């Protein structure tokens, strides 16, 4: 399977509340590293997951990767990753503002 298929599988697993399996699948997307858009989406989903579960250090690990590359991602993918970029920016700002 490629990164895009693993991403879809991970999202389905999250929807079914199969959290451990979803985390494993989304990490496979990152390890495969065959599609920058899928990797970015997987990192965003993982960052959101860890933010919601109050594991802020782990959330920062994933979201900071997007936050640091937002100009590059916007230039290369135009609006395709705008939601992921916005999510990473908002959550990073919240963690900085509230010292989470």
Region locations from a protein language model:
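Flexible helix-coil transition and linker loops at the boundaries of alpha-helical arrays
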Residues: 31-36, 71-81
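TPR/TPR-like (Sel1-like) alpha-helical repeat modules
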Residues: 54-75, 93
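Residue signature of alpha-solenoid helical repeat architecture, marking inter-repeat boundaries
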Residues: 1, 37-39, 83
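Terminal, low-structured helical/coil segments at or just beyond the last alpha-helical repeat
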Residues: 3, 76-100
């Amino acid at each position: 399977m490629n990164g895009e298929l693993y991403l879809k599988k991970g999202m389905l697993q999250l929807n079914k509340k199969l959290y451990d399996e979803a985390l494993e699948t989304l990490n496979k997307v990152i390890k495969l590293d065959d599609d920058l858009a899928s990797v970015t989406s997987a990192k965003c989903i993982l960052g959101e997951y860890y933010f919601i579960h109050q594991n802020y250090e782990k959330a920062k690990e994933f979201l900071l990767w997007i936050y640091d590359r937002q100009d590059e991602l916007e230039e290369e993918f135009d609006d395709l990753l705008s939601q992921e970029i916005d999510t990473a920016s908002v959550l990073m700002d919240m963690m900085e503002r509230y010292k989470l």
